[in-house]
UniProtKB/Swiss-Prot annotation:
Keywords: ANK repeat, Cell membrane, Endoplasmic reticulum, Lead, Lipid-binding, Membrane, Metal-binding, Peroxisome, Repeat, Signal-anchor, Transmembrane, Transmembrane helix, Transport. It comes from the Eukaryota. The lineage of its organism: Eukaryota, Viridiplantae, Streptophyta, Embryophyta, Tracheophyta. Its main location: membrane. One of its GO terms (molecular function) is lead ion binding. It comes from Arabidopsis thaliana. This is Acyl-CoA-binding domain-containing protein 2. Induction: In roots by lead. An acyl-CoA binds at residues 136-140, 162, 181. PANTHER family: ACYL-COA-BINDING DOMAIN-CONTAINING PROTEIN 2, ACYL-COA-BINDING DOMAIN-CONTAINING PROTEIN 6. The chain crosses the membrane at residues 11-31.
Length: 354
Protein backbone atom coordinates (compact mmCIF):
# COMPACT_ATOMS: atom_id res chain seq x y z
CA UNK A 1 0.00 0.00 0.00
CA UNK A 2 2.88 2.32 0.85
CA UNK A 3 4.45 1.70 -2.59
CA UNK A 4 1.23 2.75 -4.34
CA UNK A 5 1.14 6.00 -2.31
CA UNK A 6 4.71 6.85 -3.27
CA UNK A 7 3.98 6.08 -6.93
CA UNK A 8 0.90 8.32 -6.93
CA UNK A 9 2.87 11.10 -5.30
CA UNK A 10 5.62 10.80 -7.91
CA UNK A 11 3.09 10.91 -10.73
CA UNK A 12 1.45 14.05 -9.30
CA UNK A 13 4.81 15.79 -8.88
CA UNK A 14 5.75 14.81 -12.41
CA UNK A 15 2.55 16.27 -13.79
CA UNK A 16 3.07 19.50 -11.88
CA UNK A 17 6.67 19.75 -13.10
CA UNK A 18 5.60 19.05 -16.68
CA UNK A 19 2.91 21.74 -16.47
CA UNK A 20 5.37 24.32 -15.12
CA UNK A 21 7.94 23.41 -17.76
CA UNK A 22 5.36 23.71 -20.53
CA UNK A 23 4.23 27.07 -19.13
CA UNK A 24 7.81 28.31 -19.04
CA UNK A 25 8.42 27.23 -22.62
CA UNK A 26 5.20 28.95 -23.68
CA UNK A 27 6.27 32.19 -22.01
CA UNK A 28 9.69 32.08 -23.68
CA UNK A 29 8.16 31.45 -27.09
CA UNK A 30 5.64 34.24 -26.59
CA UNK A 31 8.41 36.63 -25.53
CA UNK A 32 10.43 35.87 -28.64
CA UNK A 33 7.39 36.35 -30.84
CA UNK A 34 6.70 39.68 -29.17
CA UNK A 35 10.26 40.78 -29.89
CA UNK A 36 9.62 40.23 -33.57
CA UNK A 37 6.40 42.27 -33.67
CA UNK A 38 5.92 46.01 -34.07
CA UNK A 39 4.35 47.83 -31.13
CA UNK A 40 2.84 51.33 -31.10
CA UNK A 41 2.41 53.68 -28.18
CA UNK A 42 -0.75 55.79 -28.49
CA UNK A 43 1.14 59.07 -28.05
CA UNK A 44 4.53 58.22 -29.50
CA UNK A 45 5.94 57.39 -32.91
CA UNK A 46 6.70 53.85 -34.10
CA UNK A 47 9.43 51.98 -32.25
CA UNK A 48 11.59 49.40 -33.91
CA UNK A 49 12.01 46.37 -31.62
CA UNK A 50 14.98 44.26 -32.62
CA UNK A 51 15.24 40.52 -32.00
CA UNK A 52 17.82 39.17 -29.65
CA UNK A 53 21.15 38.26 -31.13
CA UNK A 54 20.88 40.66 -34.08
CA UNK A 55 23.46 43.43 -34.41
CA UNK A 56 21.61 46.73 -34.04
CA UNK A 57 24.11 48.49 -36.28
CA UNK A 58 23.14 46.14 -39.10
CA UNK A 59 19.46 46.89 -38.68
CA UNK A 60 20.16 50.64 -38.78
CA UNK A 61 22.27 50.30 -41.90
CA UNK A 62 20.89 51.52 -45.21
CA UNK A 63 22.47 48.54 -47.00
CA UNK A 64 20.86 45.15 -47.75
CA UNK A 65 22.27 41.74 -46.91
CA UNK A 66 19.88 40.78 -44.12
CA UNK A 67 19.38 37.03 -43.74
CA UNK A 68 16.84 34.74 -42.18
CA UNK A 69 15.19 36.27 -39.15
CA UNK A 70 16.35 39.79 -39.93
CA UNK A 71 14.82 39.66 -43.40
CA UNK A 72 11.52 38.54 -41.90
CA UNK A 73 11.60 41.48 -39.52
CA UNK A 74 12.11 43.99 -42.31
CA UNK A 75 9.27 42.45 -44.30
CA UNK A 76 6.91 42.80 -41.33
CA UNK A 77 7.82 46.36 -40.45
CA UNK A 78 7.77 47.86 -43.93
CA UNK A 79 9.13 51.39 -43.81
CA UNK A 80 9.64 51.52 -40.06
CA UNK A 81 13.37 50.96 -40.50
CA UNK A 82 13.73 54.08 -42.62
CA UNK A 83 11.73 56.02 -40.04
CA UNK A 84 14.12 54.86 -37.36
CA UNK A 85 17.11 55.92 -39.41
CA UNK A 86 15.49 59.32 -40.01
CA UNK A 87 14.90 59.62 -36.29
CA UNK A 88 18.57 58.92 -35.60
CA UNK A 89 19.57 61.57 -38.14
CA UNK A 90 17.22 64.03 -36.44
CA UNK A 91 18.82 63.35 -33.08
CA UNK A 92 22.26 63.89 -34.59
CA UNK A 93 21.06 67.18 -36.11
CA UNK A 94 19.76 68.25 -32.71
CA UNK A 95 23.16 67.47 -31.23
CA UNK A 96 24.86 69.61 -33.87
CA UNK A 97 22.36 72.41 -33.29
CA UNK A 98 23.21 72.29 -29.61
CA UNK A 99 26.90 72.64 -30.39
CA UNK A 100 26.23 75.52 -32.79
CA UNK A 101 23.97 77.22 -30.26
CA UNK A 102 26.64 76.97 -27.58
CA UNK A 103 29.25 78.46 -29.90
CA UNK A 104 26.87 81.29 -30.83
CA UNK A 105 26.16 82.01 -27.16
CA UNK A 106 29.87 82.17 -26.42
CA UNK A 107 30.55 84.46 -29.37
CA UNK A 108 27.64 86.71 -28.36
CA UNK A 109 28.85 86.90 -24.76
CA UNK A 110 32.33 87.80 -25.96
CA UNK A 111 30.91 90.51 -28.22
CA UNK A 112 28.82 92.08 -25.45
CA UNK A 113 31.78 92.04 -23.09
CA UNK A 114 33.95 93.69 -25.72
CA UNK A 115 31.37 96.42 -26.33
CA UNK A 116 31.03 97.25 -22.65
CA UNK A 117 34.81 97.30 -22.28
CA UNK A 118 35.15 99.55 -25.32
CA UNK A 119 32.47 101.83 -23.90
CA UNK A 120 34.50 102.29 -20.74
CA UNK A 121 37.56 103.23 -22.81
CA UNK A 122 37.39 106.94 -23.55
CA UNK A 123 39.98 106.52 -26.30
CA UNK A 124 37.72 104.12 -28.16
CA UNK A 125 35.90 105.29 -31.28
CA UNK A 126 32.54 106.96 -30.74
CA UNK A 127 29.63 104.83 -31.88
CA UNK A 128 26.68 106.65 -33.54
CA UNK A 129 23.57 106.81 -31.41
CA UNK A 130 21.46 104.94 -33.96
CA UNK A 131 23.92 102.04 -33.88
CA UNK A 132 23.90 102.11 -30.08
CA UNK A 133 20.14 101.81 -30.11
CA UNK A 134 20.27 98.99 -32.65
CA UNK A 135 22.74 97.08 -30.48
CA UNK A 136 20.51 97.65 -27.48
CA UNK A 137 17.45 96.29 -29.27
CA UNK A 138 19.30 93.21 -30.50
CA UNK A 139 20.70 92.58 -27.04
CA UNK A 140 17.25 92.74 -25.45
CA UNK A 141 15.80 90.37 -28.06
CA UNK A 142 18.67 87.93 -27.56
CA UNK A 143 18.39 87.95 -23.77
CA UNK A 144 14.73 88.68 -23.03
CA UNK A 145 12.79 88.13 -26.25
CA UNK A 146 10.12 90.43 -27.76
CA UNK A 147 9.46 93.76 -26.06
CA UNK A 148 6.72 93.65 -23.43
CA UNK A 149 7.76 96.72 -21.43
CA UNK A 150 5.43 99.75 -21.42
CA UNK A 151 6.41 102.68 -23.60
CA UNK A 152 8.37 105.33 -21.65
CA UNK A 153 7.34 108.96 -21.54
CA UNK A 154 8.15 111.04 -24.60
CA UNK A 155 10.23 113.28 -22.37
CA UNK A 156 12.57 110.46 -21.46
CA UNK A 157 14.37 110.62 -24.74
CA UNK A 158 17.01 107.98 -24.13
CA UNK A 159 14.64 105.46 -22.61
CA UNK A 160 12.09 106.00 -25.36
CA UNK A 161 14.70 105.56 -28.10
CA UNK A 162 15.88 102.32 -26.53
CA UNK A 163 12.33 101.06 -26.18
CA UNK A 164 11.59 101.82 -29.83
CA UNK A 165 14.77 100.04 -30.94
CA UNK A 166 13.71 96.96 -28.99
CA UNK A 167 10.03 97.08 -29.90
CA UNK A 168 10.51 97.43 -33.66
CA UNK A 169 12.41 94.12 -33.83
CA UNK A 170 9.15 92.35 -33.08
CA UNK A 171 9.42 88.59 -32.60
CA UNK A 172 12.89 88.18 -34.09
CA UNK A 173 14.44 84.84 -33.01
CA UNK A 174 17.14 85.23 -30.32
CA UNK A 175 19.69 83.39 -32.48
CA UNK A 176 19.18 85.86 -35.33
CA UNK A 177 19.53 88.77 -32.91
CA UNK A 178 22.81 87.35 -31.62
CA UNK A 179 24.15 86.91 -35.14
CA UNK A 180 23.21 90.47 -36.15
CA UNK A 181 24.70 91.85 -32.94
CA UNK A 182 28.00 90.09 -33.65
CA UNK A 183 27.88 91.28 -37.26
CA UNK A 184 27.49 94.94 -36.22
CA UNK A 185 30.30 94.68 -33.66
CA UNK A 186 32.53 93.14 -36.33
CA UNK A 187 31.74 96.00 -38.71
CA UNK A 188 32.61 98.54 -36.02
CA UNK A 189 35.68 96.71 -34.75
CA UNK A 190 37.06 94.23 -37.33
CA UNK A 191 39.62 92.94 -34.81
CA UNK A 192 37.27 92.90 -31.85
CA UNK A 193 37.79 89.22 -31.09
CA UNK A 194 41.42 89.71 -30.08
CA UNK A 195 40.54 92.70 -27.96
CA UNK A 196 37.49 90.94 -26.54
CA UNK A 197 39.55 87.99 -25.33
CA UNK A 198 42.09 90.26 -23.69
CA UNK A 199 39.39 92.39 -22.12
CA UNK A 200 37.67 89.29 -20.82
CA UNK A 201 40.81 88.13 -19.07
CA UNK A 202 41.29 91.51 -17.44
CA UNK A 203 37.86 92.81 -16.63
CA UNK A 204 35.25 90.08 -16.45
CA UNK A 205 31.92 90.99 -14.93
CA UNK A 206 33.30 94.09 -13.22
CA UNK A 207 34.10 95.68 -16.56
CA UNK A 208 30.59 95.02 -17.78
CA UNK A 209 28.84 96.24 -14.67
CA UNK A 210 30.84 99.45 -14.36
CA UNK A 211 30.95 100.41 -18.01
CA UNK A 212 29.90 103.90 -18.99
CA UNK A 213 31.06 106.28 -21.68
CA UNK A 214 30.41 106.67 -25.38
CA UNK A 215 28.17 103.64 -25.56
CA UNK A 216 26.41 104.56 -22.35
CA UNK A 217 24.65 101.85 -20.35
CA UNK A 218 23.81 99.98 -23.55
CA UNK A 219 22.56 96.90 -21.74
CA UNK A 220 20.63 98.60 -18.98
CA UNK A 221 16.89 98.41 -18.42
CA UNK A 222 14.53 101.03 -19.79
CA UNK A 223 14.61 102.95 -16.53
CA UNK A 224 15.81 106.47 -17.22
CA UNK A 225 18.35 107.01 -14.46
CA UNK A 226 19.02 110.72 -14.70
CA UNK A 227 21.53 110.77 -11.88
CA UNK A 228 23.74 107.94 -13.11
CA UNK A 229 23.77 108.36 -16.89
CA UNK A 230 26.67 110.40 -18.16
CA UNK A 231 24.55 111.36 -21.17
CA UNK A 232 22.65 113.85 -19.01
CA UNK A 233 24.43 116.54 -17.04
CA UNK A 234 22.37 119.04 -15.10
CA UNK A 235 23.25 121.91 -12.81
CA UNK A 236 21.86 122.45 -9.34
CA UNK A 237 19.24 124.88 -10.62
CA UNK A 238 17.78 122.20 -12.88
CA UNK A 239 17.68 119.78 -9.97
CA UNK A 240 15.84 122.29 -7.79
CA UNK A 241 13.27 122.90 -10.54
CA UNK A 242 12.88 119.19 -11.08
CA UNK A 243 12.34 118.44 -7.40
CA UNK A 244 10.13 121.47 -6.73
CA UNK A 245 12.49 123.11 -4.24
CA UNK A 246 11.34 126.73 -4.40
CA UNK A 247 13.70 128.22 -1.81
CA UNK A 248 16.85 126.67 -3.26
CA UNK A 249 15.71 127.61 -6.76
CA UNK A 250 15.31 131.26 -5.76
CA UNK A 251 18.68 131.23 -4.00
CA UNK A 252 20.32 129.94 -7.17
CA UNK A 253 18.74 132.66 -9.29
CA UNK A 254 19.62 135.35 -6.76
CA UNK A 255 23.22 134.13 -6.70
CA UNK A 256 23.52 134.93 -10.39
CA UNK A 257 22.78 131.61 -12.06
CA UNK A 258 20.90 132.29 -15.33
CA UNK A 259 17.23 131.43 -15.11
CA UNK A 260 17.47 129.97 -18.62
CA UNK A 261 20.58 127.87 -17.92
CA UNK A 262 20.61 124.74 -20.07
CA UNK A 263 21.58 121.17 -19.27
CA UNK A 264 23.36 118.81 -21.67
CA UNK A 265 20.06 118.16 -23.47
CA UNK A 266 19.30 121.86 -23.90
CA UNK A 267 16.56 121.90 -21.27
CA UNK A 268 15.99 124.92 -19.06
CA UNK A 269 14.73 124.82 -15.46
CA UNK A 270 11.28 125.64 -16.88
CA UNK A 271 11.39 122.49 -19.01
CA UNK A 272 12.18 120.45 -15.90
CA UNK A 273 9.48 122.05 -13.79
CA UNK A 274 6.85 121.26 -16.41
CA UNK A 275 8.18 117.77 -16.94
CA UNK A 276 7.53 117.07 -13.26
CA UNK A 277 4.24 118.94 -13.13
CA UNK A 278 5.33 121.75 -10.80
CA UNK A 279 2.99 124.62 -11.71
CA UNK A 280 4.21 126.71 -8.76
CA UNK A 281 7.82 126.37 -9.91
CA UNK A 282 6.81 127.29 -13.45
CA UNK A 283 5.16 130.47 -12.16
CA UNK A 284 8.25 131.37 -10.12
CA UNK A 285 10.52 130.87 -13.13
CA UNK A 286 8.28 132.87 -15.46
CA UNK A 287 8.14 135.60 -12.84
CA UNK A 288 11.94 135.61 -12.98
CA UNK A 289 11.80 136.12 -16.76
CA UNK A 290 12.25 132.53 -17.86
CA UNK A 291 11.86 132.11 -21.63
CA UNK A 292 8.54 130.34 -22.24
CA UNK A 293 9.60 129.58 -25.81
CA UNK A 294 13.07 128.18 -25.08
CA UNK A 295 13.85 125.09 -27.15
CA UNK A 296 15.79 122.01 -26.07
CA UNK A 297 18.09 120.04 -28.36
CA UNK A 298 15.05 118.39 -29.94
CA UNK A 299 13.47 121.76 -30.69
CA UNK A 300 10.74 121.33 -28.07
CA UNK A 301 9.49 124.21 -25.96
CA UNK A 302 8.04 124.04 -22.44
CA UNK A 303 4.59 124.06 -24.07
CA UNK A 304 5.53 120.93 -26.04
CA UNK A 305 6.34 119.29 -22.71
CA UNK A 306 3.09 120.38 -21.12
CA UNK A 307 1.04 119.05 -24.04
CA UNK A 308 2.84 115.72 -24.27
CA UNK A 309 2.55 115.22 -20.51
CA UNK A 310 -1.13 116.19 -20.63
CA UNK A 311 -0.70 118.93 -18.04
CA UNK A 312 -3.59 121.21 -18.96
CA UNK A 313 -3.23 123.75 -16.15
CA UNK A 314 0.44 124.33 -16.92
CA UNK A 315 -0.19 124.45 -20.67
CA UNK A 316 -2.94 127.03 -20.23
CA UNK A 317 -0.67 129.09 -17.99
CA UNK A 318 2.09 129.05 -20.61
CA UNK A 319 -0.29 130.06 -23.38
CA UNK A 320 -1.43 133.01 -21.26
CA UNK A 321 2.27 133.91 -20.96
CA UNK A 322 2.47 134.10 -24.77
CA UNK A 323 3.89 130.64 -25.36
CA UNK A 324 3.94 129.92 -29.10
CA UNK A 325 1.41 127.19 -29.94
CA UNK A 326 2.81 126.93 -33.48
CA UNK A 327 6.49 126.46 -32.59
CA UNK A 328 7.90 123.49 -34.51
CA UNK A 329 10.27 120.91 -33.04
CA UNK A 330 12.91 118.98 -34.99
CA UNK A 331 10.22 116.59 -36.24
CA UNK A 332 8.10 119.45 -37.52
CA UNK A 333 5.45 119.12 -34.81
CA UNK A 334 3.98 122.04 -32.90
CA UNK A 335 2.34 121.82 -29.46
CA UNK A 336 -0.99 122.09 -31.27
CA UNK A 337 -0.06 119.11 -33.46
CA UNK A 338 0.84 117.01 -30.44
CA UNK A 339 -2.20 117.92 -28.39
CA UNK A 340 -4.49 114.89 -28.20
CA UNK A 341 -6.72 116.30 -25.47
CA UNK A 342 -9.84 118.36 -26.07
CA UNK A 343 -8.65 121.74 -24.88
CA UNK A 344 -10.84 124.40 -26.56
CA UNK A 345 -8.74 127.25 -25.23
CA UNK A 346 -5.59 126.08 -27.06
CA UNK A 347 -7.52 125.90 -30.35
CA UNK A 348 -8.94 129.35 -29.77
CA UNK A 349 -5.48 130.68 -28.95
CA UNK A 350 -4.09 129.25 -32.18
CA UNK A 351 -6.90 130.87 -34.20
CA UNK A 352 -6.25 134.24 -32.56
CA UNK A 353 -2.56 133.93 -33.36
CA UNK A 354 -3.41 133.31 -37.03
Amino acid sequence: MGDWAQLAQSVILGLIFSYLLAKLISIVVTFKEDNLSLTRHPEESQLEIKPEGVDSRRLDSSCGGFGGEADSLVAEQGSSRSDSVAGDDSEEDDDWEGVESTELDEAFSAATLFVTTAAADRLSQKVPSDVQQQLYGLYKIATEGPCTAPQPSALKMTARAKWQAWQKLGAMPPEEAMEKYIEIVTQLYPTWLDGGVKAGSRGGDDAASNSRGTMGPVFSSLVYDEESENELKIDAIHGFAREGEVENLLKSIESGIPVNARDSEGRTPLHWAIDRGHLNIAKVLVDKNADVNAKDNEGQTPLHYAVVCDREAIAEFLVKQNANTAAKDEDGNSPLDLCESDWPWIRDSAKQAD
